[in-house]
């Protein structure tokens, strides 16, 4: 095994806020005159403790135009998509719930890291879903991510707003579709999405300028592929690499998860224990990104054998990075990490 890990030189000094975030934060403060009133906006943010971007409310308006009776089902027949998560609050579904749900767990799939907030449910068989991805809990999302939880932990980036994400999904569906009977409906929806996004001034690229700027600040991709951003100063303080590559770390995880007995498992855990020691050194020297990376990777691997280590690493990293809400979300998720029971508002 390599030494204590080395700092990774960065071509550009980093700050806590990614490029473009200040501009987006200002945009989030203005009133774009959607049908969603201020009281309802505040309700969403109070229950989730997260600020919602304008495109969230604009997309609700768009879906109301498609299906006034049930905007959440506006994309169901054409795309097999349903608006969930914070959209349940706009539809007042939470008012009918007899229990007090934990919205940190509402539509939180097995592999969703704390940075991910589900907003759209897709194919239930693969547990396909889309959500906002935030680098900071008190900032606006940096992109829309897509995951299929039954297939693994990979997060695919689909633009920086819901219109772009749904359009990209639609265009992919059109390419894969063999039957032609619904093409007219898909074409009509495609044109409607493009027209409304243009009217609102929203970009429709899969990778926007702000997303490319963020990529320059990503210190490591992590297992899920979306990457993590931490502040790195001009002296490269903030992040140091793990002493294992992703491939070798996955082999270590596999050996632990598939060990035939406790003795073999304890032996296989030795490299992880050594890395935890390196993380402690890194934290002492303000390289908080190292523990963040290891914690996210072990969370992504998903084995219950890592839950204790993840609890040891990630809340500490989030606190050191002043991202405490993500630590709260993680704790709630690990206490109730399930492949099922995703809808916290479902009748029990």
Swiss-Prot record:
Species name: Danio rerio (Zebrafish)
Disrupted-gene phenotype: Morpholino knockdown of the protein causes malformation anbd delayed hatching.
Record localization: Chromosome; Nucleus
Tissue: In adult, mainly expressed in gonads.
Protein name: Histone PARylation factor 1
Coiled coil regions, renumbered to chain: 170-200
Main location: nucleus
Active-site feature positions: 285 (proton donor)
One Gene Ontology term of the molecular function aspect: poly-ADP-D-ribose binding
Domain of life the protein comes from: Eukaryota
């Amino acid at each position: 095994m390599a030494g204590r890990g080395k700092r990774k030189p960065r071509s550009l000094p980093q700050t806590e806020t990614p490029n473009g975030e200040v501009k987006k934060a200002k945009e989030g403060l203005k009133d774009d005159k959607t049908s969603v009133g201020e009281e309802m906006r505040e309700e969403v943010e109070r229950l989730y403790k997260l600020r919602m971007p304008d495109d969230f409310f604009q997309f609700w308006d768009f879906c109301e135009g498609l299906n006034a009776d049930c905007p959440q089902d506006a994309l169901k027949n054409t795309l097999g998509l349903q608006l969930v998560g914070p959209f349940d609050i706009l539809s007042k579904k939470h008012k009918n719930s007899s229990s007090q749900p934990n919205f940190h767990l509402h539509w939180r799939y097995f592999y969703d890291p704390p940075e991910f907030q589900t907003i759209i449910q897709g194919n239930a068989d693969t547990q396909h879903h889309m959500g906002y991805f935030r680098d900071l809990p008190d900032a606006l999302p940096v992109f829309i991510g897509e995951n299929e939880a039954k297939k693994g932990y990979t997060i695919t980036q689909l633009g920086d707003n819901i219109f772009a994400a749904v359009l990209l999904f639609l265009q992919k569906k059109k390419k894969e579709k063999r039957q032609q009977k619904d093409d007219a409906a898909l074409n009509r929806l495609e044109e409607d999405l493009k027209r409304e996004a243009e009217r609102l001034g929203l970009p429709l690229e899969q990778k926007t300028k702000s997303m490319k700027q963020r990529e320059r600040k990503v210190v490591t991709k992590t297992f899920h592929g979306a990457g993590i951003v931490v502040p790195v100063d001009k002296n490269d303080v903030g992040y140091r690499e793990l002493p294992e590559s992703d491939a070798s770390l996955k082999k270590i995880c596999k050996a632990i998860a598939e060990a035939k007995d406790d003795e073999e498992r304890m032996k296989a855990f030795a490299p992880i224990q050594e890395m935890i020691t390196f993380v402690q050194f890194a934290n002492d020297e303000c390289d908080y990104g190292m523990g963040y990376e290891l914690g996210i990777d072990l969370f992504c691997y998903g084995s219950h054998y890592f839950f204790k280590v993840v609890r040891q690493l990630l809340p500490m990293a989030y606190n050191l990075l002043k991202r405490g809400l993500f630590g709260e979300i993680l704790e709630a998720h690990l206490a109730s990490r399930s492949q099922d029971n995703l809808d916290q508002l479902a009748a029990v």
